[in-house]
Amino acid sequence: MTHILFAVLVLALLALAFGIILGFAAVKFYVEADPIVDQLDALLPQTQCGQCGYPGCKPYAEALANGDQINKCVPGGDATMRKIADLMGVDPQPLGSAEAAIPVKKVAFIHEDQCIGCTKCIQACPVDAIVGATKAMHTVITDECTGCDLCVDPCPTDCIEMIPVPTTVDNWKWDLASVAIPVKIVE
């Protein structure tokens, strides 16, 4: 019994000593983060889709702080690019290349008759837009899907297809900045 108490006491003292050492090291070797990277990261949509060419939003924010192009975030769209331009003090640019200036929004569609319920697409989806259970068919919540295309490659049966979202009154992007609105000033 005394051997057990002695072992517990020694482990507790070691844990306390290592905790003090780690606390001291955290204070002594603290590295100040770049505040602009944190601000840029807060503006990005956090989908971690990789369409910008970086493995996630934080690495893209670091690249933006180092002077990379501000128009690579497709899920963030034009609004995010304009916020980044305002923060960085640069002119807004069209998204992607010249052909991608007007992107076609796409969402994932699962052909449920071909789905085997492997859950690989659910694991790949960064925004949890796919619902389903193991060995049961899955489906996509289209309002949540960002169209990042990350769920297509892991699917072993190729039952996921990216389809364009039809333009309706509900999802139409009105360009009110270019529309002249007549105003009459009454005195």
From Swiss-Prot:
Binding site for [4Fe-4S] cluster 1: C49, C52, C57, C73
Coiled-coil segments: none
Binding, [4Fe-4S] cluster 3: C125, C145, C148, C151
Places the protein is found: Cell inner membrane
Gene Ontology BP, a term: electron transport chain
Cofactor: [4Fe-4S] cluster
NCBIfam families xref list: PRK05113.1 (NF003475), rnfB (TIGR01944)
Subunit annotation: The complex is composed of six subunits: RnfA, RnfB, RnfC, RnfD, RnfE and RnfG.
Stated role: Part of a membrane-bound complex that couples electron transfer with translocation of ions across the membrane.
Protein name: Ion-translocating oxidoreductase complex subunit B
Organism lineage: Bacteria, Pseudomonadati, Pseudomonadota, Gammaproteobacteria, Aeromonadales
Name of the encoding gene: rnfB
